[in-house]
């Protein structure tokens, strides 16, 4: 088995673009030698997850309605960090915005993980945050969040 790319790209066309994603469609020859198409979603932000832990090993999750799945979801605290912004600065912002928490001790636990590499190039990062102080949450205007504290 070789690690060389078995796909051949014949052409690529941008099909959709907005401030968060770009969708490209490529005409390809697949590894079986057949003509085909392949769609790729390019994410313009990096995905960031934060697991806050207090001194009693409690954590926080946020609940919100997700348009994509048409369901209410309970999730770790997460958000997007633009290219060029320091990952830790973005993580601190998301923790305060979504959960109303400020942390004094940060440890990166995921340093670049492909999240859905069959259809997108989204890369995810994650931190554990400790030394917590509670402040007022300040979610984005489109986020209607519930916050739950629970044992880790």
Task: Please name every model-derived segment.
Residues 2-6, 41, 49-93, 132-135:
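Conserved Nudix-box catalytic region and its N-terminal flanking loop in Nudix hydrolases
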Residues 11-49, 55:
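Acidic, metal-coordinating catalytic segment for phosphate/diphosphate chemistry
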Residues 44, 139-152:
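NUDIX/MutT-family hydrolases
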Residues 6-14, 107-111:
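Short secondary-structure junctions
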Residues 25-27, 52, 128-130, 151:
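Short, well-ordered beta-strand micro-motif
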Residues 42-45, 53-56, 66, 75, ...:
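Active-site segment of metal-dependent pyrophosphate-handling enzymes
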Residues 22-26, 72, 123-125, 146:
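Short beta-strand micro-motifs in enzyme catalytic cores
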């Amino acid at each position: 088995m070789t690690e060389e790319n078995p796909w051949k790209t014949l052409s690529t066309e941008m099909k959709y673009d907005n401030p968060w994603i770009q969708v490209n469609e490529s005409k390809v020859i697949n590894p079986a030698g057949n003509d085909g198409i392949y769609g790729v979603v390019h994410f313009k932000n990096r995905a960031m997850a934060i697991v806050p832990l207090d001194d009693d090993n409690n954590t926080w999750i946020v609940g919100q309605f997700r348009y994509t799945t048409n369901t209410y979801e309970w999730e770790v605290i997460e958000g997007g960090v633009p290219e060029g912004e320091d990952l830790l600065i973005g993580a601190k912002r998301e923790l305060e915005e979504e959960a109303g928490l400020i942390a004094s001790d940060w440890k990166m636990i995921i340093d670049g993980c492909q999240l859905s590499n069959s259809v997108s190039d989204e890369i995810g990062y994650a931190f554990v945050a400790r030394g917590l102080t509670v402040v007022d949450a300040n979610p984005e205007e489109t986020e209607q969040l519930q916050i739950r504290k629970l044992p880790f």
